[in-house]
């Protein structure tokens, strides 16, 4: 197929760098965030005030990381740099100053791709969306149905302050959800006189009742107010004026305890129209008075005062890596501060040095904890390049300081008008996290305050000005403008054609003439996320199916020979580039050398630039990362050009699946309920074959009886089984292995007690000591096979860090080729997913008029009820493109080029294709898009014409090989003695409540009895049954299930006198069957206790 790509519609602009969110945030942390924290942290003085320790934050430096990225991955190390900062210790008494550079901990560094390497695993820090600090006004209905208003001042850290009104028009204040306090008591405690307050209010008459109420309570002075405040906030402690002052100061006016943050100060100034300087981060009197004034205006329903919508994106901000890390550094430094103060007090003042005072451990621990176990630090989804890119652009409302799944209501999860162009309305998980985890829209960026902005073209007198740079607006600013959508039709000069344009204004829709339009959206794609923007004809799909399509593209397995989609959207190349999976040249020049492992580019000055390619690396999801050169020696390359394809890339574009010939028709019931019928060609031609790399690991540990040994000499193993092992007992690279084969031979010393009786007998007779070790080798698990790709040996002598108690670690990487098979899951890009039900020989598949058999047969009933008609457009456009020998790019939302444009374009392409020589049969004007197929088995034509075409189909990561599982015998749960569940534990199938009903309904009493006893948790019964089967005797009657005994014990532990009795009323001892020699009952009965204790004198 030729690589010429026809662009049906032109996208307005290129997308911005898609991983900028991560990189820019980390850069800010290194340049500003870290310095800010170190500066806020110093000086630290001891309790006497004699010594002072200053951190000179701007002079911190990072050392070169010990390992580079690849080395860190290989050694299971962290890609991190050591932080040093200059400290100054000042002795106030002697004036002596000691300056020293001190090590304060290790900081993991971000790789170029926006990820972190922690303990050898690639991780991503997900962006968090939280409520912005600031002041919020809300209304509530009290129990009498009267509307009351309240105002909350929410800081970045510190106590919340909430003002509220009651039915008597009194103003109250709560600090951190404590008891209500009269608002005027707080004013007086802050040192404000009645006049100070009244002068600042526009409607003081409303506030008068609060002043009178405070006077009635006898709180007339600042001291009394402070005492009252202390009583309310610290009930039970003896109040004092100084205590009240101290409390008030520490709660609201101490920068270490209370911080509005830059954002909080900006939001409060904006809402209350104040001019407090940016660097004042604590509460001011002005803030409090203006809040009260605004609240009174709301109560009196005076214009200009408005309520806040907490789900509006103007009131929610994004915390990216840099800020999350900054918060964590603050936690670490606070822990460090306590240690420094203690050491200052304990140590000898004269001989102390900064290095002795500063212990890096608390800071290291805090950073480690964040990267290792925070909810926002996630193991990177590396299934394919798109999954990686989407993961870095994910925005989560969960995590520390955010919401929890259980508490989040519908309002938070819902799509809000302010999401337009900022968060994708389509891409979100299905299930409990729906709406809490979102994806950043394609053109969106995060501004310095953490609010999401999106770009627009300015419109001047009805003409779209595309000459200058686009204007980025946050949600707050956009509300004040009239914004037209991106698919507005314009003439070639940029003048808007229509007389009335639909615009969004203050979260509503209205129609206005062109000269009233302020801005036009940059591109139709800017509303949706990256994954969604790869769906062609998206506008013809129902949102639920588009959501599934977006999510399933992230689960596509990279194939052996990827193929770009015939019908794309034009964003494929940018996704591949920004994912970091394809190497890109940074200079103009000529390719001077190419092989499978490296590409060398010589620039115009004759300098050589080396690009090393990844070969068959294992990804986090066990898929294969591999890069293939696409340039030849002598090629001219320009800066930014792609040099090699990564996994799931072809020609520098993302290629998640294959273009296959699809027919929509039922076939013998094999595509009932979304099942998929596929041709054998998919297997034989390796269309959907993927490479998976499994990692197996074994440790040789130090045991009580001596060290474990990795060796070739394994007891009771045939020489044949050791064929592929080297002299150390480790498998050779390139060997083919099946399940059960030994990968690494290991023997463990065993103690006297471990020996079976026959060995003891041999010893007693011959006095010879059989080698007392047992086989503990690493073997290939059940259902797995493949070829050994790599072996890595880690020992302490080589300088590797090993887990405690281990002397040696061996890792074996086994690659396997997985062809497509029955039970694998496949999907298109429109949420049309299914499981393969049968693989049919290609001669039996329905075939086209020219004799070509189709590759896949899908059920036509999968389209109408699901309303994802985009798949039909893609099918026919793909059919036309394949026959025209070209590829097509279709931008979503194409009605700006005319009504019903998708329809017309597809039809025009089909007509064009049928004009090619010998292709007249491709398009039938009487039945457009359908062809008469013949049955491969009989050669007879089918009754009706069938929709046929080329579609891009993906193989998803839910492979049957990873899920299929069977158990004959295996491990049991200790308490209930029932088989464990799940493949990993070699578990059994659960026979649940409903399955029991089914057997009861059929009256299959004996089957049911043995399922609930012998086959499950009747311990004695199952042993007896096994013996009976081995000896060929009839199976004895089942006994009591263990779980019933557990239930009895639990009821007895609650103090219930409960037992099991026969018809005659004799108690049955349930524990009898475990130890037949035990005569005492399982719980004390009057008979067993004897009556001697209870006999009367």
Swiss-Prot record:
Keywords from the named record: DNA-directed RNA polymerase, Nucleotidyltransferase, Transcription, Transferase
InterPro entries, A to Z: DNA-dir_RNA_pol_bsu_ext_1_sf, DNA-dir_RNA_pol_bsu_external_1, DNA-dir_RNA_pol_su2, DNA-dir_RNAP_su2_dom, DNA-dir_RNAP_su2_hyb_sf, RNA_pol_bsu_bac, RNA_pol_bsu_CS, RNA_pol_bsu_protrusion
GO CC list: DNA-directed RNA polymerase complex
Compositionally biased tracts (Polar residues): 1077-1091
Statement: the UniProt record of this protein carries the keyword Flavoprotein: no
NCBIfam families documented for this protein: PRK00405.1 (NF001616), rpoB (TIGR02013)
Protein name as catalogued: DNA-directed RNA polymerase subunit beta
């Amino acid at each position: 197929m030729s690589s010429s790509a026809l662009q049906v519609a032109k996208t307005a602009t290129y997308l911005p760098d898609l991983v900028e969110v991560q990189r820019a945030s980390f850069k800010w942390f290194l340049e500003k965030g870290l310095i800010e924290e170190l500066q806020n942290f110093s000086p630290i003085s001891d309790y006497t005030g004699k010594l002072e320790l200053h951190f000179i934050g701007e002079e911190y430096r990072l050392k070169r990381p010990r390992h580079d990225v690849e080395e860190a991955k290989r050694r299971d190390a962290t890609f991190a740099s050591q932080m040093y900062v200059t400290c100054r210790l000042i002795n106030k008494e002697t004036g002596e100053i000691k300056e020293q550079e001190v090590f304060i901990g290790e900081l993991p560094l971000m790789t170029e791709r926006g990820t972190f390497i922690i303990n050898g695993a690639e991780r991503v820090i997900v962006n968090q969306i939280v409520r912005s600090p600031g002041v919020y006004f809300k209304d509530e209905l009290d129990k009498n149905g009267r509307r009351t208003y309240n105002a909350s001042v929410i800081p970045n850290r510190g106590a919340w302050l909430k003002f509220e009104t009651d039915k008597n028009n009194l103003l109250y204040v709560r600090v951190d959800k404590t008891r209500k306090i009269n608002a005027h008591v707080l004013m007086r405690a802050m040192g404000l006189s009645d006049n100070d307050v009244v002068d600042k209010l526009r409607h003081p008459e409303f506030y008068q009742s609060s002043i009178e109420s405070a006077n009635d309570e006898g709180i007339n002075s600042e001291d009394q107010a402070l005492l009252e405040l202390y009583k309310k906030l610290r009930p039970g402690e003896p109040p004092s004026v100084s205590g009240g002052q101290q409390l008030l100061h520490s709660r609201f006016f101490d920068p270490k305890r209370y911080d509005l943050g830059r954002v909080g100060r900006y939001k409060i100034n904006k809402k209350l129209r104040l001019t407090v300087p940016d660097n004042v981060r604590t509460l001011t009197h002005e803030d409090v008075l203006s809040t009260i004034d605004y609240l009174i205006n709301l109560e009196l329903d005076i214009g200009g005062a408005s309520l806040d919508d907490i789900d509006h994106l103007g009131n929610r901000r994004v915390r990216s890596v840099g800020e999350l890390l900054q918060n964590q550094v603050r936690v670490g430094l606070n822990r460090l501060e306590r240690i420094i103060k203690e050491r200052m007090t304990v140590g000898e003042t004269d001989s102390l040095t900064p290095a002795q005072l500063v212990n890096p451990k608390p800071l290291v621990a805090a950073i480690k904890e964040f990267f290792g176990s925070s909810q926002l630090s996630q193991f990177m989804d590396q299934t394919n390049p798109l999954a990686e890119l989407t993961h870095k652009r994910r925005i989560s409302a969960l995590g520390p300081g955010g919401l929890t799944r259980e508490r989040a209501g519908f309002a938070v999860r819902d799509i809000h008008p302010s999401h337009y162009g900022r968060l994708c309305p389509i891409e979100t998980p299905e299930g409990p996290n729906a709406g809490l985890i979102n994806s950043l829209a394609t053109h969106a960026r995060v501004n310095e305050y953490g609010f999401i902005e999106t770009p627009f073209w300015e419109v001047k007198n009805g003409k779209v000005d595309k000459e200058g740079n686009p204007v980025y607006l946050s949600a707050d600013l956009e509300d004040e403008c009239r914004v037209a959508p991106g698919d507005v039709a314009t003439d070639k000069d940029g003048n808007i054609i229509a007389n009335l344009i639909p615009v969004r204004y203050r979260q509503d829709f209205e129609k206005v003439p062109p000269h009233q339009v302020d801005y036009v959206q940059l591109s139709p794609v800017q509303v949706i996320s990256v994954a969604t923007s790869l769906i062609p004809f998206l506008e013809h799909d129902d949102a639920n199916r588009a959501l599934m399509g977006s999510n399933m593209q992230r689960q596509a397995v990279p194939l052996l020979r990827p193929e770009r989609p015939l019908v794309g959207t034009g964003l494929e190349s940018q996704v591949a580039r920004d994912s970091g999976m394809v190497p890109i040249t940074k200079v103009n020049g000529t390719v001077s050398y190419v092989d499978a492992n490296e590409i060398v580019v010589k620039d115009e000055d004759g300098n050589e630039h080396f690009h090393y390619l990844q070969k068959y690396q294992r990804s986090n999801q066990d898929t294969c990362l591999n890069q293939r050169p696409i340039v030849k020696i002598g090629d001219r390359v320009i800066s930014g050009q792609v040099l090699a394809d990564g996994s799931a890339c072809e020609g520098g574009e993302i290629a998640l699946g294959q273009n296959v010939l699809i027919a929509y028709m039922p076939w013998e019931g094999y595509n009932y309920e979304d099942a998929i019928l596929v041709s054998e060609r998919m297997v034989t031609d390796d269309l959907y074959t993927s490479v998976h790399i499994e990692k197996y690991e074994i440790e040789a540990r130090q045991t009580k009886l001596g060290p474990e040994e990795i060796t070739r000499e394994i007891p009771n193993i045939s020489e044949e089984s050791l064929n592929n092992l080297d002299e150390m007992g480790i498998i050779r690279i390139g060997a083919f292995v099946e399940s059960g084969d030994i990968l690494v031979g290991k023997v463990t010393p065993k103690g006297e007690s471990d020996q079976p009786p026959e060995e003891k007998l041999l010893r007693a007779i011959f006095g010879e000591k059989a080698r007392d070790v047992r086989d503990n080798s690493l073997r290939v698990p059940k259902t797995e096979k493949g070829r050994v790709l790599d072996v890595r040996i880690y020992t302490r002598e080589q300088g590797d860090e090993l887990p405690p108690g281990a002397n040696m670690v061996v890792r074996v990487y086994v690659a396997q080729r997985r062809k497509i098979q029955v039970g694998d899951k496949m999907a298109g890009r429109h949420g049309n997913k299914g499981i393969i039900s049968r693989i049919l020989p290609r001669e039996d598949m329905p075939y086209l008029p020219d004799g070509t058999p189709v590759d896949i047969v899908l059920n036509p009933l999968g389209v109408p009820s699901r309303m994802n008609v985009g798949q039909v457009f893609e099918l026919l456009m793909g059919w036309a493109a394949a026959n025209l020998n070209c590829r097509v790019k279709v931008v979503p939302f194409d009605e700006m080029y005319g009504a019903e444009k998708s329809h017309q374009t597809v039809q025009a392409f089909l007509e064009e294709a049928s004009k090619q020589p010998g292709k007249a049969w491709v398009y039938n004007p009487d039945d457009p898009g359908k062809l008469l197929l013949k049955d491969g088995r009989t050669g007879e034509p089918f009754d009706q014409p069938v929709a046929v075409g080329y579609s891009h189909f993906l193989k998803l990561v839910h492979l049957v090989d990873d899920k299929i599982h069977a158990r004959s015998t295996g491990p049991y749960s200790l308490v209930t003695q029932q088989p464990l569940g799940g493949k990993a534990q070699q578990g059994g199938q659960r026979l649940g409540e409903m399955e029991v009903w089914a057997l009861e309904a059929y009256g299959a009493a004996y089957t049911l009895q043995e399922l609930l006893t012998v086959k499950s948790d009747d311990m004695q019964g199952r042993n007896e049954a096994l013996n009976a089967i081995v000896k060929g005797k009839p199976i004895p009657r089942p006994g009591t299930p263990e779980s019933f005994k557990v239930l009895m014990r639990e009821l007895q532990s609650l103090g219930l006198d409960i037992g099991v009795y026969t018809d005659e009323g004799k108690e049955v001892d349930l524990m009898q069957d475990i130890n037949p020699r035990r005569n005492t009952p399982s719980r004390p009965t009057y008979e067993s206790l004897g009556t001697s204790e209870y006999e009367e004198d």
